């Protein structure tokens, strides 16, 4: 634990990425200095013609969406007949210490979207963003809208903030002095160590994610049991310092992304109000990182979009990763979008089981006709290596 810099939450020796987590079959079909693009092997006789791209948070590894076959959202999407791709962020090293928010939007998300369209031959794709991956996706879509380009046919946003006026517990730690210190620290580049992120998120829930394990591991001498989700939680990543400093100031501190024209990204003024596409917004009721009020606020930020908002039980991760087959927990729907989440909940209907069923029903008619599947990649973009690729296996030192 001293060497790792954090208290062990699970028996990490039980897991290996690509062996028993992140095991969905597929291939890396494109890579650059920021990400690898993975396309998954079809599991159905026919697939929808419009491809589907998943964008996870760059502050974690992508395999939270592909833990094991029985709780993999990736596998669920593939089983629904979607030609599924995912963006696997590289764990930043010294070569990436200068990378900015603009780099992640342009060379990351926008490039990934373009490559998916080139590989599939489609004109538009369906795209999903999770946590800060959703915030970055909304930014990328706004950049494209300013350029009068629309690559996305629909967008799904899972537990993400666009309006940071209600950022939850994290907002208590961020003020002008803290942000200015980080900006000075990373003015010439540098990396935010993975351990800093891991410990920050752990101490947001100290009784559950710190002291519980201190007592069991150190006082009782017990060995933590294997748990795939906690293994992923411990497999944190570094972040480029300039990216991190920009994110702190323009979201948590000044909430500038939601102010039309207040922020310039990739040479374009950001205006979420110019986005015009069907969107599915999901928030978790007990989320301590993206409060349900903050998740719901996106319904009013995306004022020109055809929107559906759904609330699930549980928290930031467990609420999202709630496989349909296990029939656990519940979710709420309401076709109306009143001004507050309190009003929305009052008019909502509770459903037993996973919200995945509702989302699948929403996405299917947006995915086009079905046709015979193809192997991952094409003649130009051939398989580089099997999924999950080597980027996700790079551990933070």
Positions of predicted regions on the chain:
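Short, surface-exposed "cap/lid" segments of acyl-processing enzymes
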Residues: 4-94
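Alpha/beta-hydrolase active-site loop
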Residues: 96-120
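Short beta-strand/loop motif that positions the catalytic acidic residue
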Residues: 275, 281-283, 287
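Catalytic histidine neighborhood in serine/cysteine hydrolases
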Residues: 248, 298, 302-338
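Gly/Ala-rich beta-loop-alpha elbow adjacent to hydrolase catalytic centers
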Residues: 129-137
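Conserved alpha/beta-hydrolase "acid-adjacent" motif
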Residues: 288-294
